[in-house]
Amino acid sequence: MAKTLYEKLFDAHVVYEAENETPLLYIDRHLVHEVTSPQAFDGLRAHGRPVRQPGKTFATMDHNVSTQTKDINACGEMARIQMQELIKNCKEFGVELYDLNHPYQGIVHVMGPEQGVTLPGMTIVCGDSHTATHGAFGALAFGIGTSEVEHVLATQTLKQGRAKTMKIEVQGKAAPGITAKDIVLAIIGKTGSAGGTGHVVEFCGEAIRDLSMEGRMTLCNMAIEMGAKAGLVAPDETTFNYVKGRLHAPKGKDFDDAVAYWKTLQTDEGATFDTVVTLQAEEISPQVTWGTNPGQVISVNDNIPDPASFADPVERASAEKALAYMGLKPGIPLIEVAIDKVFIGSCTNSRIEDLRAAAEIAKGRKVAPGVQALVVPGSGPVKAQAEAEGLDKIFIEAGFEWRLPGCSMCLAMNNDRLNPGERCASTSNRNFEGRQGRGGRTHLVSPAMAAAAAVTGHFADIRNIK
């Protein structure tokens, strides 16, 4: 029977499936960070259990860390306790930890792929909703809760029901300057923020195949923002070339054997999906969210929508509430909306290609008066690479702040946050009320669009910036 990529990955990992019971899946990689793991390790300790597969478990610090100093005390008591607990737990249970002083430390979903921990065909879990990022490699990757973190630590397995399948095909080629972030925001604009609920999404089509691995990671990272369980892109030569030579990737003949298997990880001809969505790449322009969920998104050259234009009463009420929170009036051009802060970073857009795209806009320009702009590389290796290329100097000369790796202003769990009423052009993944700080107003954009907002002081079409 013809199978989708998701069905192949799921079926290959079923350890046991009794009739009328939820299947038990084997987990190939478990990524751990300081926020969702302390109680899980306490649970192991209370029952005298070891970590079943410490060699398949990798930990880092990201959510709570300061991006201005490597001092563990910098972000307050709760952050310090969580980081100290992670150090203690990893030492006691034999788990590899990339702590604040480790050169590989960084956002968990940046660290995994760049170290070759993430490989095609794997099941990957983490106590973090944006674990879907790793699906860019043709891996089944999804976020789990803290009780499930404990279960995986103890057994290297997890009970998981089968999801529905969705194909999202982006046909044709994207226009110059249109990024994976624009593509995925356009997709969510079409599906809505709950359009993928109960599904695992496979992204395909020419515009997706044209993306680099970093672009595919941005795409899959935000699958969760349309309500999907996970996002997938079938592995191809782009994938294999990215993986080859990385620290934890197979070497020599093992790599060749792995590639031979990875090439089978494609949706079969004739396989059926529960839901199919199609977009035309050439119709996608630079995207900016205007509301308080990622589906409330428009082209940069559009006007803020009028809630009265929504036929659905729920959407209309949601739009009214969003505009009130965001302090926006219907009908005004988006490019007239001024911003206070810019955040370039997060597990969505903090990799080297993202920083290059932002630096290209920042070069030779200055951050607009009254705007604070942060650039936060996703990991130690990304920061080192950017500095080797001189990107840090471009940003600093333009008036951006060049920070240490971490989750930073994506979420208000550290010192980087918005004050009430502040408006931010952000390359992160969520624009919910209070996500970047109580009363903060978040607009999601690509790295180049964020840099353009920083230097102009308002939203601007990067295609018009010469």
UniProtKB/Swiss-Prot annotation:
Keywords: 4Fe-4S, Amino-acid biosynthesis, Branched-chain amino acid biosynthesis, Iron, Iron-sulfur, Leucine biosynthesis, Lyase, Metal-binding. Belongs to the aconitase/IPM isomerase family. LeuC type 1 subfamily. HAMAP family: LeuC_type1 (MF_01026). Heterodimer of LeuC and LeuD. The keyword Iron applies. It is an enzyme of class 4 (lyase). One of its GO terms (molecular function) is metal ion binding. Binds 1 [4Fe-4S] cluster per subunit. It catalyses: (2R,3S)-3-isopropylmalate = (2S)-2-isopropylmalate. Its EC number is 4.2.1.33. [4Fe-4S] cluster binds at C347, C407, C410. It comes from the Bacteria. The keyword Metal-binding applies. Pathway: Amino-acid biosynthesis; L-leucine biosynthesis; L-leucine from 3-methyl-2-oxobutanoate: step 2/4. Its cofactor is [4Fe-4S] cluster. GO terms for biological process: L-leucine biosynthetic process. This is 3-isopropylmalate dehydratase large subunit. Catalyzes the isomerization between 2-isopropylmalate and 3-isopropylmalate, via the formation of 2-isopropylmaleate.
